[in-house]
Amino acid sequence: MKNLVSNLRFFSSYSSSIVPRCSNIPKPILNPLYNLLPQSQNPSKIVDVICSTLNHSDYSVLLPNLRDEVKSLIPHLGYPEISRVLLRFQSDASRAITFFKWVKFDLGKRPNVGNYCLLLHILVSSKKFPLAMQFLCELIELTSKKEEVDVFRVLVSATDECNWDPVVFDMLVKGYLKLGLVEEGFRVFREVLDSGFSVSVVTCNHLLNGLLKLDLMEDCWQVYSVMCRVGIHPNTYTFNILTNVFCNDSNFREVDDFLEKMEEEGFEPDLVTYNTLVSSYCRRGRLKEAFYLYKIMYRRRVVPDLVTYTSLIKGLCKDGRVREAHQTFHRMVDRGIKPDCMSYNTLIYAYCKEGMMQQSKKLLHEMLGNSVVPDRFTCKVIVEGFVREGRLLSAVNFVVELRRLKVDIPFEVCDFLIVSLCQEGKPFAAKHLLDRIIEEEGHEAKPETYNNLIESLSRCDAIEEALVLKGKLKNQNQVLDAKTYRALIGCLCRIGRNREAESLMAEMFDSEVKPDSFICGALVYGYCKELDFDKAERLLSLFAMEFRIFDPESYNSLVKAVCETGCGYKKALELQERMQRLGFVPNRLTCKYLIQVLEQPSLPNHLPEN
């Protein structure tokens, strides 16, 4: 087959005599008795009946009704009959596609691979490429998991029977790539070329790009080698892809050879090519190669631009060589190239990462002096840098300074700083910053920010301020989270405001926020502090029975309080028995408290009788 069709690469064929016939479609076995039947009931006439309907001017209307008219013949419509109908209409793609869809959808029969391939040849030779690609992708999906089916071979075999155009084989490779089956596409690509057919440079580029994304560098070079061997001329896009392949796969000493090869192919390496190479090397930490290319650019009279220098600066920063990066930055400025926000951000980020905040601020002021507007990233990395260094007040002052200079600061940066202040136990500074932002810009903080602020104020026992914020959230119909309730209830119990803590717990229940062992412990602590042991016991019972929360720390707090107040061993023992009936299990600490109360001199000399 390879020898017979090797010179069919670039032209269409409308003769089935060029390729040897392989008689794909079996001839029907005719029974003489069938001729005694009416045509609509004669199995040997099913193809004629269908074709007669298709030849009618109203075929699209008549064909759907044909199923009922020839109902008895439908079981005799097999794959060979479908193929014969398609072949009769190979010069009329509209009727062929109407018939194919009728078989598939109205009759519910699934055409086989051979039927699909005949239809594809008909559509491609009729120049109906989008429709052909649709059915081609459908065929690939049907056969992609069947190793025994080779769509390419069936397509080649089908050329014996009908008009065809070699572009169908190019489309076959594209179809696999379109469906993301890159490795299968590569296999078919080799099959197509080994059989003497051609593939377009556009398809080759798609294949190269797919293989590059899969990190299959050797296969990329194989594709390029085959392209050169069979005479498919690469274009600009080909070399752009190969540039990326080269950066991933090659040694920098081969750069000159690669660039010379590009020139031999008539492709002049330009600034974009060099920038792609430099950027790729810098991203992979291959700075020696990147600077080698930077020198080659001058030798070849290609002047590096802002993109080149930014890539080099970024590579040096990534390697921890911040001072060298800054020197490269100065060299760029000295050569008349004006830095942009990205080049400044690269250096600022590197200095922040090294904890050199003064240098970062200095660069920011330099940006403003050069009329380069800082973006979200600039503000974010500097604020995060101050926070990482534990210099939260410096971060606040920095934000205030930027606002004074009319620099737009993203609210999420301020939000991050507010939360950081809360986590560091500085809720008043956080609240002051939030109030200022709301007053000046009208931004409203997220519920999570308010929750963090309430928690921080509660931890500092600033309960009044915390309750004001909590009321604000409730007025906005926002639900407090469990952490916020924990902080508020814990604070109220700590400062002896147990009734308010109880009200908050009831509010939790109404809001369907489940309490936890911390809230149980906080309330037990508050009740014990007031010597209200009965209430503490009732609370433990409520949590055990309603929420299945058996908190040993809360239980031990109550036992300890009972023992330390001189209530006597008998009362402590009775409490323990009641708790055990609820499901509480005494531990070593419980036993320790009971033993301590037993050893107190004020106790009677004998234990109570059982």
UniProtKB/Swiss-Prot annotation:
Gene3D superfamilies: Tetratricopeptide repeat domain. Signal peptide: none annotated. It holds the Pfam family PPR. InterPro entries: Pentatricopeptide_rpt, PPR-containing_protein, TPR-like_helical_dom_sf. Keywords: Repeat. PPR repeats lie at residues 165-199, 200-234, 235-269, 270-304, 305-339, 340-374, 375-409, 410-445, 446-480, 481-515, 516-546, 551-586. NCBIfam families: PPR. Belongs to the PPR family. P subfamily. This is Pentatricopeptide repeat-containing protein At5g40400.
